[in-house]
């Protein structure tokens, strides 16, 4: 079993492997999710794309991808910021719509009204409001309110006021 052409097979494997890596690298950037601006229904900018990109740099700098849950095992490695943010958004949206119904007295809400508000919040959170042509997401009034409260919450939390 004397083979003098082993290098041809090695070269073929290296070319195929390198081609795969190059293809995956290209696909990663080509198929990356959009980074839109987030605006209120009245057109006020809530979150700009540049702010999302700055946040992404902080996320990477402090390796925050190492925190939170993975495979449903809970927040064993640290706080799950995504779950916390989503929960706070839902709570703030419920609060916003509840105050609209009762003129700021949430104790007046009946269970049926609370259930209706909860359904509305779930529907709004699941709706895709992305406009690909303008690269924007138009938030609902409740989402815009919750986004502002979320910024206040995390600003306070990370500055030590919370």
Descriptions of predicted regions:
Residues 1-48:
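Post-cleavage N-terminal segment of exported redox proteins
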Residues 31-162:
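Soluble extramembrane regions of membrane proteins in the secretory/endomembrane system
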